[in-house]
Amino acid sequence: MKKYLFIAMICLLLVLLVSCTVPYSFMHGEPDIDTIKIEIVNLETEMGYHAGSPYNEENISVIKVIETDKNEEFLSDFKKIKSYQPNFGSRIDCISGVAIRITYANGDIELITDYGTATVKNGEIHNQTTTFDSDAFSELIDKYS
């Protein structure tokens, strides 16, 4: 009986731990605020940006370019948003809608929506299932738009 109780407790603990929030880690670690460009954009394509597909700049409209002197404040506000990396369920295969685009000095790009992220390296898209608190994400977008 104790064995089953112990196994049940371990299972419960595992379920609780996998649903914990995790801090979002940027593509290149902590960005150098002086060498990045941050924009709020709309990923307009109906099909979204699929993993492995080529990056297409034509389907993106810029809503707002964050001024360089506001980069640090913007990233500080962004880091306050809770992020989750679900271990169960289906993974996203594309992202679309309003996003944060971070362009690094080497040309790599990070696209962040409230329900998923994508990185662009050498023109190829790689999606990740990282979700953010959608209300806090929307408030951030509204604050800087």
Spans of features found by a protein language model:
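Function-determining sites in protein domains
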Residues: 20-145
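Sec-dependent N-terminal signal peptides of Gram-positive bacterial secreted proteins and lipoproteins
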Residues: 4-23
